[in-house]
Every structure is written in structure tokens, then in C-alpha cells.
Amino acid sequence: MSRGLGDVYKRQTVYFGGGTPSVLGADRLCDILDFIKFNFNIQNNAEITVEVNPDSAKTIDFEKMYACGFNRISMGMQTAVEDELRLLGRIHSIDDAKTSVERAKSAGFNNISLDLMMGIPNQTIESLEKSISFCADCKVTHISSYILKIEENTPFYKVQNKLKLADDDMQAEMYLKAVEMLDSLGYKQYEISNFAKQGYESRHNTNYWRCGEYIGIGPSAHSFFEGKRFFYSRSMDDFNNNKLSFEGTGGDEEEFIMLSLRLKSGLNYYEFEEKFGYTLPSYIIKKAKEYEKYGYTNVTDKSISFTPKGFLVSNSIISELI
């Protein structure tokens, strides 16, 4: 793959994710990054992110990682309330998270993101506010805040009937409170679940939401390139043998509309026309306009976008638009 793409396409971002790459340690992570830089055309000011969890980050050599080229940290903290961490099955403490952020900053990292979760069993508005305040006190530049989803084959799924889970109304209240509080602290919403200080929006994830191309490397990694979607299975043997599975095409009008509307800036009419060669159908604009009276959408002569309240029902509205 690197032989076919390395010299042709200049890569603007590199992202180490898909689990907990920090368990590899700084030496191996830097070796992999060096390999990527050697085989791919990575631009000089590329955003290079690595996901870490607060437990493995206690001992990782942040200085070495910063020196070899990593410049952004994404940390899966989830909550700043110890009881909620235990419910989630996380083994780190709040002190671990704080120490890890401080160590990363001391090493030179000034672009750090923390993940928060809403709708945790027994979580309250007050405990959510505590978690948000903790992130702000850490002076990180980016916060992602997601609503808990109960997936099959997870510990929560098996015992969900015994848990006090937030209902839809409580989840909505938490989401709107998070948006309001984060905004007051200088974290501006730029995507349905993502908030950043000015200039620190995730370039890597924004590329996904703008239907940009990306190459995924490793078991279970997905790619979108030259209009085609493909992926590696979970099998290490398949990956070692470069056995790819194809999902079909991507980047069509419906996908562009759906992904653009995840962004706070919304669906830009000019960008749609530039990409597809014709103007956005007027019925889409007209339909989106109908939801303005409910406080769900903002429709101008340039774009359609969702309000924070609208993001809560965006899936159903988008299904009507496309």
C-alpha cells in the first residue's frame, strides 16, 4: 500500500487509534511513526495523534513521543467521578488522568483532548458538571462528549435491566447542559459531540465528516480512497497477507449531506455544488426550513445547520431530507 500511495498523496494527519495504542510504549510507537514517515508523504505541519488511556499513560515516555513527531494526545478519561469510573469498568483513577495530562504537557504537548461520557448509570447533571469542570481545570484544548450507547455483547448489555440508566429526556438534558457549559468555558462546538478551543478542532476527524479520503492500516481498519470503501478483517493473518474486503462506493450526495450535517457549520450549498456539479435540490432546503420553527435548524442563503437541540433529533430529520 505504501509503495502505491507514498510518493503521490501528501498526508495531512496521522491517527493512532483503534483501541489503546499507548500499551505498545513509546519506543514501538515511534518506530511505527518513523516507518510511516519514511513510506508515506507526510506534510511538515501534519496533525499526528495517539490515543492513550490514563492508566497506561502513567508510565509512557511522553518526551520521546513528542520528540519523534507526535503532537496531539487523545485521552479516554470518560468521567471525573470515581464511582462512575468503577461502573464503567475503568481501572484508572481521576488522579491518574490529571497526572497523565500534566506529564504530557511537561513533555511539550499543547494539543490534548479528553473524552467524556454522558448517560452513565447513576450519573447526574451535577456529576457531569464536575467532569466538565475537571477537564477545563486541566486546561486541555479539546473535549469530546458522547452519550453512552448500550451495545450487545458488553457487560452493560447483560445487566442493563438492573442499572439505573438515564432515559431519553435525561440524556437530552445532559447533552444541552454540556453544550452550554462547555461554550461558557471557551470550548466551541464544531461537531455534534466535539468541542474545542479556537484553532484546536481535530483535523483528522473533520476530514471524515467532510467526506475526505483516508487510509486505515491494521486489523479492522477501514479506508475510503478514490471513491471506494474497503477494510481489513480482524484477522492478523489477513492483514499480514494484505487481504482486503471491499464495501462498495462512498462519498455520494446522501453521504455528503449526512456527514456535513454532523458539523456545526452544517451543509454548505456552494461546497455541495462544487463537489457534485449541480445545486442542492430546493426541496431539501424547504424541508429543513420547516424545522426552524421548532428550534432544530438554522437555514440561511448559504447553508443548513442544526442547533444543539436539533442535534438530538438529527438522525430522524436527516432521514427525511435525503
Which residue ranges define each predicted feature?
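Conserved C-terminal portion of the radical SAM core fold
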Residues: 67-77, 95-161, 168-198, 211, ...
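Nucleotide and nucleotide-moiety/phosphate-recognizing core
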Residues: 6-7, 25-31, 35-45
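Single conserved hydrophobic/aromatic residue that forms the stacking wall/gate
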Residues: 1-9
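Hydrophobic, secondary-structure "cap" segments at the distal end of domains
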Residues: 206-292, 298
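Glycine-rich anion/phosphate-binding loops
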Residues: 54-60, 126
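Short, amphipathic alpha-helical interaction segments positioned at domain boundaries
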Residues: 309-322
